[in-house]
Regions:
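Intrinsically disordered, low-complexity segments enriched in polar/charged residues with Gly/Pro
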Residues: 15, 23, 37-40, 148, ...
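Aliphatic-rich helix starts adjacent to a transmembrane/signal segment
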Residues: 2-4, 11-65, 69-71
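Autoprocessing Asn-cyclization modules and mimics
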Residues: 89-180
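Short linear sequence signals and composition-biased patches located at protein termini or domain-edge surfaces
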Residues: 3-5, 11, 49-52, 56, ...
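N-terminal start-of-chain detector that recognizes signal peptides
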Residues: 23-26, 33-36, 42, 73-79, ...
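Intrinsically disordered, low-complexity segments enriched in small/polar residues
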Residues: 7, 12, 32-35, 147, ...
Length: 297
């Protein structure tokens, strides 16, 4: 009989301590990866916020500088929707609240007619009281959109619309000269820019439609005015003496950054004092000086 021998096998595995060490290392690695992910996510979020903020500041500056530069162009001798100056400043608005203009911000109203509304379909005769447009006669009316001018080949003539029938406008006074077919007909507007309580840059054409929001997250808007004697004023007594405008647009991020808490503060801007309470918003201030082309000619 063969001898029965007991076979033994070498046992493999991990001890409890080894397993605990491995699990601890695993969780440390996962925590590091997660922390890195959160950090990258935060950086991406802030970069997106800052990018949007910078774009908003540039957009707001673009709207303002373009139309302020053209203030007074095509302006009639009479007032347009209550405005008789090419530029009408309004300083530190809404100190007492109630008009949906952000407290402490400035407001500016300009009269300009630089945008073409239509063209003449046919030549217009001297002393005629009507003109026929190619189209877009609905841009005009006899009340709030009644002032126009016709480009008379280097000569600008203002008229007021007194009647509309299709694309035929009745105007006053009678035409001062002959205008060729294709001559530009432009609507003169009174435009007011301000910042509302929701921190939107707004644009109001003062025709009854109210202020329309243009650009979000604009925290402050301030102006300074260079006068005909070269001096600067935040509140010029005679708007007709304005020759240039310094525009200051302060944009901020849409949300606070918890890691920036207590480091952000609205800065002083022209005659608007800095805020006294710190927060977590990031900000960007853009400043531009715009010469007004059509004043002082």
């Amino acid at each position: 009989m063969q001898n029965l021998r007991k076979r033994t096998y070498k046992q493999h595995g991990f001890t409890l301590i080894e397993l605990m060490v491995a699990v601890s290392i695993f969780f440390f690695v996962i925590a590091a990866i997660y922390e890195s992910f959160l950090s990258q996510q935060h950086v991406s979020f802030i970069q997106a916020q800052v990018s949007d903020m910078q774009q908003n500041a540039r957009l707001a500056m673009g709207f303002l500088s373009k139309e302020i530069r053209m203030a007074g162009f095509g302006m009639p001798a009479t007032e347009v929707n209550g405005f008789s100056n090419a530029i009408t400043p309004a300083i530190d608005n809404n100190a007492n609240g109630g008009n949906n203009v952000l407290i402490g911000t400035d407001q500016i109203s300009i009269v300009t007619g630089y945008q073409q509304g239509s063209t003449l379909q046919s030549a217009a005769s001297f002393d005629s009281t009507t003109i026929t447009l190619v189209g877009n006669a609905n841009l005009f009316n006899t009340t709030t959109k009644s002032f126009l001018y016709i480009d008379g080949v280097g000569l600008i003539d203002n008229y007021q619309v007194t009647g509309i029938a299709g694309n035929v406008l009745t105007v006053s006074p009678p035409l001062r000269r002959v205008y060729p077919a294709g001559a530009s007909v432009l609507l003169v507007k009174a435009i007011t820019y301000s910042v509302n309580d929701a921190m939107f840059l707004t644009r109001d054409e003062n025709t009854g439609g109210g202020a329309q929001p243009l650009v979000p997250n604009i925290e402050d808007l301030q102006f300074a005015y260079q006068l005909n004697d070269g001096s600067w004023s935040n509140a010029p007594a005679v708007p007709g003496n304005i020759r240039a405008v310094r525009i200051n647009v302060l944009a901020r991020t849409s949300r606070q950054d918890p890691q920036w808490a207590g480091l952000g503060i609205r800065p002083a801007n022209e005659n608007h004092a800095a805020a006294t309470v710190k927060d977590g918003y990031r900000r960007r201030l853009l400043t531009s000086v715009v010469a007004v082309r059509n004043l002082g000619l």
